[in-house]
């Protein structure tokens, strides 16, 4: 079976899985509104097809979350008609991803971080990884890398830290990822990890192997 046929089949499977999670496009945006692109693609690994997700390591010169791992994305511009437009624009600006290479599958309910920023996860599928010519914006992105989506359901290379906010105790999840040559390591945590746990749970139709206990403010209506 060709890679094109396999990708097409995987895309149709993903569309079906996310149908029940589809949200209505937001007509009114909170003052603090942003979107991130959860860009999935399929790759042959160890005789099986594996879904992977594209991530970035933020520049250490940024004033906000320097050096942390994040999904491509950012704040909404007034010209953005919806969350999809925001996510695709930011992905182009940050990592050079051509929007024409991505098929949008779904937009999930927004998460809300501790500072009140609404973050809408936009789920996309990259058909041709080789056509994606990585072009990290040095002002924003230090590195582009990818990880297997399923790792966010496993208890391997994971730890949790208890935090408290307005009397509520919750857990922040930390996932350690090591490059294949073992020379680089990344920590994927907090809201980024929470979004990817949610996406992986939908795709693989199962709960994580660990206790999640996420903060309730992540899912406040806005």
Swiss-Prot record:
GO terms for biological process: coenzyme A biosynthetic process; malonyl-CoA catabolic process; nucleoside phosphate metabolic process. Expressed in roots, stems and leaves. InterPro entries: CoAse, NUDIX_hydrolase-like_dom_sf, NUDIX_hydrolase_dom. The chain crosses the membrane at residues 186-204. Its EC number is 3.6.1.-. It is a single-pass membrane protein. Residues 31-175 form the Nudix hydrolase domain. One of its GO terms (cellular component) is peroxisomal membrane. Coiled coil: none annotated. Pfam families: NUDIX. Its main location: membrane. The keyword Zinc does not apply. It is found in: Peroxisome membrane. It comes from the Eukaryota. CDD domains: NUDIX_CoAse_Nudt7 (cd03426). A motif (Nudix box) lies at residues 73-96. Its cofactor is Mn(2+); Mg(2+). One of its GO terms (molecular function) is guanosine-3',5'-bis(diphosphate) 3'-diphosphatase activity. Belongs to the Nudix hydrolase family. PCD1 subfamily. Coenzyme A diphosphatase which mediates the cleavage of CoA into 3',5'-ADP from CoA and 4'-phosphopantetheine. Can use malonyl-CoA, hexanoyl-CoA, lauroyl-CoA, myristoyl-CoA and palmitoyl-CoA as substrates, but not isobutyryl-CoA or propionyl-CoA. This is Nudix hydrolase 11. It comes from Arabidopsis thaliana.
